[in-house]
């Protein structure tokens, strides 16, 4: 009677093991509940690391997803702009200043402009030879900038200024403009533009085609009639390749006259045909002026014209020598100042 029955010990042992197992399970559950309650997923870890990372000023945009930085590709501008107005009545205010013209063209810098709503089909450089014509230049810029903007052109205006006392050389200045402008931009089209001619109709497109273009069909000073059938002066348009092919203008026309006919002969020599706009479109106002000192009539022009076919390969872009004094990017135009130390 003093000893426990042999079957009672296994029962108590089983009961003890049961309670021990229960306590173990409870301890495991509670330890996982109270210890490390927040499980940070990998993406959250990356976000938190980026959040606390020190970013130098000006570098915040590097956190923006690349897709948000992509610029929407613009479509090409139409061949004929919807902004054209046609014939305009030109007004020239006697007290107009360059500052006033600049205020009207806030999006122009260094004479450069491009449309924001579409991609221009051509890059156009307008080259204007100049000396002592500040008022004419102001009038031309006043009308030419909005004229070109309505045509939705990617353009730049270059004024090529001849300093010194030698006779004026329009053709050589235009060669200089072509060479210097190409150092800044690979222009598709070049407009060779007299400073005293202002276009009246913006359907007269300042672009280049398969053939050279003569844009001045008529002007007020000639009753809006063509000066003569083969006239190729005033304002002309040649592509980069066309002008290079004929070796540009001759450099030997000092004073007034002959250089535009020389260029026409070069164009014809290369079997190119000159096109013109409709007479109602190719109309210009010529701002009145007297003959400039240093731009007297070139009495040798006919002799030079007869030499063209023999000398065109060696007289032109390939032989254009000049001293470049400065290139200034003014708000309304880029001014290129040169000196010709040889010549008349």
UniProtKB/Swiss-Prot annotation:
InterPro entries: Galactosyl_T, Galactosyl_T_C, Galactosyl_T_N, Nucleotide-diphossugar_trans
Membrane-protein topology: Single-pass type II membrane protein
Domain of life: Eukaryota
Keyword field: Disulfide bond, Glycoprotein, Glycosyltransferase, Golgi apparatus, Lipid metabolism, Manganese, Membrane, Metal-binding, Signal-anchor, Transferase, Transmembrane, Transmembrane helix
Localization in the cell: Golgi apparatus, Golgi stack membrane
Cofactor: Mn(2+)
UniProt binding sites for UDP-alpha-D-galactose: 129-133, 168-170, 195-196, 224, 256, 289-291
Gene3D superfamilies noted in UniProt: Spore Coat Polysaccharide Biosynthesis Protein SpsA, Chain A (3.90.550.10)
PANTHER family documented for this protein: BETA-1,4-GALACTOSYLTRANSFERASE (PTHR19300), BETA-1,4-GALACTOSYLTRANSFERASE 4 (PTHR19300:SF9)
Name of the protein this chain belongs to: Beta-1,4-galactosyltransferase 4
Organism: Cricetulus griseus (Chinese hamster)
Gene: B4GALT4
């Amino acid at each position: 009677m003093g000893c426990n029955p042999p079957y009672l010990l296994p029962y108590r042992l089983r009961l003890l093991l049961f309670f021990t197992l229960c306590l173990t399970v409870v301890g495991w559950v509670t330890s996982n509940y109270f210890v490390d309650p927040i499980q940070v997923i990998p993406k959250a870890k990356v976000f938190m690391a980026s959040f606390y990372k020190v970013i130098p000023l000006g570098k915040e945009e590097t956190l923006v997803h690349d897709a948000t930085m992509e610029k929407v590709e613009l479509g090409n501008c139409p061949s004929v702009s919807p902004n054209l107005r046609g014939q305009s009545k030109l007004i020239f205010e006697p007290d107009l200043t360059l500052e006033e013209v600049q205020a009207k063209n806030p999006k122009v810098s260094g004479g450069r402009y491009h449309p924001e709503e579409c991609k221009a089909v051509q890059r156009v450089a307008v080259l204007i030879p100049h000396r002592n014509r500040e008022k004419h230049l102001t009038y031309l810029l006043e009308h030419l900038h909005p004229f070109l903007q309505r045509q939705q052109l990617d353009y730049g205006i270059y004024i090529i200024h001849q300093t010194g006392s030698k006779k004026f050389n329009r053709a050589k200045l235009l060669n200089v403009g072509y060479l210097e402008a190409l150092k800044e931009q690979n222009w598709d089209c070049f407009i060779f533009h007299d400073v005293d001619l202002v276009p009246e109709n913006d359907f007269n497109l300042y672009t280049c085609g398969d053939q050279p273009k003569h844009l001045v069909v008529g002007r007020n000073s000639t009753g809006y009639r063509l000066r003569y059938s083969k006239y190729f002066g005033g304002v002309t348009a040649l592509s980069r390749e066309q002008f290079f092919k004929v070796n540009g203008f001759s450099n030997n026309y000092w004073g007034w006259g002959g250089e535009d006919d020389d260029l026409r002969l070069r164009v014809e020599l290369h079997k190119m045909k000159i096109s013109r706009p409709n007479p109602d479109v190719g109309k210009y106002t010529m701002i009145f002026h007297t003959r400039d000192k240093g731009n007297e009539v070139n009495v040798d022009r006919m002799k030079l014209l007869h030499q063209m076919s023999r000398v065109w390969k060696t007289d032109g872009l390939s032989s254009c020598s000049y001293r470049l004094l400065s290139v200034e990017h003014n708000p309304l135009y880029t001014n290129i100042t040169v000196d010709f130390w040889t010549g008349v």
